[in-house]
Amino acid sequence: MNGILPLYKPTGMTSADAVYHARKILGIKKIGHSGTLDPNVDGVLPLAIGAGTKAVPQLMASGKVYTGEITLGFATTTEDLDGEVVDKTPLTQPFTADQLDAALTAWTGNITQIPPMFSAVKVNGRRLYEYARAGETVKRPERQATVSQFTRTDEPVFSATDGTQRFRFEVHVSKGTYIRTLAVDVGKTLGVAAVMSQLTRVKSGGFTLKQAVSIEQLKAHAAAGTLADVIQPIDIAFADLPQVDLTVEQFEAISHGRFLSLDQQTPRVRLHFAGVLKAIYRREDDQYRPDLMFLANEKNV
């Protein structure tokens, strides 16, 4: 079995746990995910199955869309609600909608982020969260990210009792963007402490939340023998590349790793034979050469 499974990961489950459950249900060991979701974040987690694992870099390179909530007035060690409160800046009056929108706009475009201490980024061979759990702080490398859209999606709610204000948002980002840090940065722009108080990934790898399948639904499909209904073909990860349908002779040629002369000009193409993705070829010196091979890929039934 080969393909891409858009899985719904609930809150409280790690991405590794989601992979474990999928392996157990499908009886397949070769399964990987295309971008970690923190335990307290729910949403779309595309899983690559079998030969589909070769498509993970392509899936990870795609942009992601999140919806969530930012709360102004306090900060935590983890930049979300899981951490300990380390700063309080009680609001005596609410920010206007225009002020909030301007702060979001300020973090739209090409931005620079410093990864949070509670993250999986490695520094000197150790994960940042390992330093954080040991009570250590290290210098973290800056990372570039792109925020193509960052908008408020509801009316802000102010609590005079708590000195907080919260509002929901939708954000479209490039891979590797830390939404927790984005929430904190919005607070800095407004001059107050802030946390990400809720987050859902609604699009990843080209898959939307509506397409995502829960663990329970996956079990039901496995029992009914209808897994082909939810496991998408590998080529969906390369849908932006031109498709070339191979002749028998051309398929024989790529089966032996040979180059092809094609009536194409794009940097990469996806090669199909008998309706199934068999290879990704890249253009070099007026010929197309092997990039990724999927010769054993067949239709899931």
Swiss-Prot record:
Q: Which residues form the active site?
A: 38
Q: Alphabetically list the UniProt keywords.
A: Isomerase, tRNA processing
Q: Which reaction does it catalyse?
A: uridine(55) in tRNA = pseudouridine(55) in tRNA
GO terms, biological process:
mRNA pseudouridine synthesis; tRNA pseudouridine synthesis
Q: Tell me the Pfam families matching this sequence.
A: TruB_C_2, TruB_N
PANTHER family, per this entry?
PSEUDOURIDYLATE SYNTHASE TRUB1 (PTHR13767:SF2), TRNA-PSEUDOURIDINE SYNTHASE (PTHR13767)
Q: Which family does it belong to?
A: Belongs to the pseudouridine synthase TruB family. Type 1 subfamily.
**The name this protein goes by in its record:** tRNA pseudouridine synthase B
